[in-house]
Amino acid sequence: MVKMYYEADVKQEVLRGKTIAIIGYGSQGHAQAQNLRDSGYKVVVGLRPGKSWDVAAKDGFEVLTVAEATKRADVVQILMPDERQAQVYRDEIAPNLKSGAALCFSHGFNIHYAQIVPPADVDVIMAAPKSPGHLVRRVYQEGFGVPGLIAIYQDATGNAKDLALAYSSGIGCTKAGVIETSFREETETDLFGEQAVLCGGASELVKAGFDTLVEAGYAPEIAYFECLHELKLIVDLMYEGGLARMRYSISDTAEYGDYSTGRRIITDETRKEMKKVLAEIQDGTFARNWILENQANRPGFTSRRRLESEHGIEVVGEQLRGMMSWINKDTKKEEVKIGQ
């Protein structure tokens, strides 16, 4: 069984009086910075000039260059996109990192795949909320917290675990519960979930269902509702109570179709391919390909993004979502928060 930690396990004094630098002010950056400040910790934000600088300043933070924020900080939480972290670390963080400080991450990609190699005299920890930033912030403001993960990669001071727990408490996670993991486990399972299920798997399944109905002569609008729009209804039920809650809530006809058809779609061959995907994550193949793609200025990524945006489901979806005022309102409200 995994080890769970809660508020009673936290030694907040290990973080009191320290300066925390949040590097990046996107989805997680804005939420973690504000939660930590509201928990009574001293927070500065390290950024390069741009939109996020103005947003962080408007939110009342002292905004510094990444180099200056690192010089000032006892804890440096790197919350920039994975593909930008290594260069920013080499150019601006590493030369200014204090001995005995802590490097903190919310995803282990750059540590696990050695794109960031920290010096031996700093702690390297993870504090990873298992929710998007806007939810991390909203739930904290309601007096609660979202679940999270902690991991220790390097314990130079002997206080790394206590520091990870105190940081997690500062952003609200120990109110819900924090699971101890490793940088390897978090990185590999996170990438697999994204690729095989949440993003790659789900998007291809949705498109395949949409295409099947449209090619059979059904209206694209109806296909969109059946294969994409209603997915949220099902996922929300799973989120609230697992597969059992979902199956309890749907009709018996839908439940019978689940049992009789599901394994015809996700076949043994699909499961074998999932194992190949996991192996490519474990042996570094995916990481190498993604790093090289970025070094080449993302030609394949950019091309695929354009092609996907032209798929029929996007065309009809844009029209139908225009009828849904609540979606447009919610999207606009979070637009600033999720931009990097």
From Swiss-Prot:
Enzyme nomenclature, EC number: 1.1.1.86
Residue positions binding Mg(2+) 1: 190, 194
What does the entry list under GO cellular component? Answer: cytosol
Q: Which Pfam families match?
A: KARI_C (PF01450), KARI_N (PF07991)
PROSITE patterns this protein is in?
Answer: KARI_C, KARI_N
What are the residue boundaries of the KARI N-terminal Rossmann domain, all occurrences included? Answer: 2-181
Tell me which residues this entry annotates as catalytic: 107
Q: Which residue intervals define the domain KARI C-terminal knotted in the entry?
A: 182-327
Q: Which residues bind Mg(2+) 2?
A: 190, 226, 230
Cofactors that this protein relies on: Mg(2+)
Q: What class of enzyme is it?
A: oxidoreductase
Job description of the protein: Involved in the biosynthesis of branched-chain amino acids (BCAA). Catalyzes an alkyl-migration followed by a ketol-acid reduction of (S)-2-acetolactate (S2AL) to yield (R)-2,3-dihydroxy-isovalerate. In the isomerase reaction, S2AL is rearranged via a Mg-dependent methyl migration to produce 3-hydroxy-3-methyl-2-ketobutyrate (HMKB). In the reductase reaction, this 2-ketoacid undergoes a metal-dependent reduction by NADPH to yield (R)-2,3-dihydroxy-isovalerate.
Recorded protein name is: Ketol-acid reductoisomerase (NADP(+))
From which organism does this entry originate? Brevibacillus brevis (strain 47 / JCM 6285 / NBRC 100599)
Q: Organism classification, top ranks?
A: Bacteria, Bacillati, Bacillota, Bacilli, Bacillales
Corresponding gene?
Answer: ilvC
